[in-house]
Amino acid sequence: MAETRIVVGHAPFSVGEEYPWLAERDEDGAVVTFTGKVRNHNLGDSVQALTLEHYPGMTEKALAEIVEEARGRWPLGRVTVIHRIGELWPGDEIVFVGVTSAHRSSAFDAGQFIMDYLKTRAPFWKREATPEGDRWVDARDSDKLAAKRW
């Protein structure tokens, strides 16, 4: 039976605490995880903080749809998607994607797919605090191109 966990919230997460749930199914031979962190720079400027906003309810629905689309493309076991919101600092963990499958190629591909679609389809808004002031972060062309490959 396939299982999915989706969490959007302010609380920090622990990669070490997420792994055991992903890894406990004996039918899954691959566990692939990705953890994204807040960088201390963007567009050539120093980033002092990052504030993430979302559309409650709609964001979780969009993430669930992304995971279901991944399940339609690859034979997946468990999937976890965690995305933090609120004010974050350089070095803070912001997103976690964990995917299990019988084989590594499906797990790797599905993990990349979920991240690529999360970056382009999930309703999150980012505001960076820089020494020059706050600014909203636009979607990157590279993220759009990455999503198009699927």
Where are these regions (language model features)?
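N-terminal, polar/charged subdomain of small-to-medium soluble alpha/beta proteins
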Residues: 1-94, 102, 106-112, 116-150
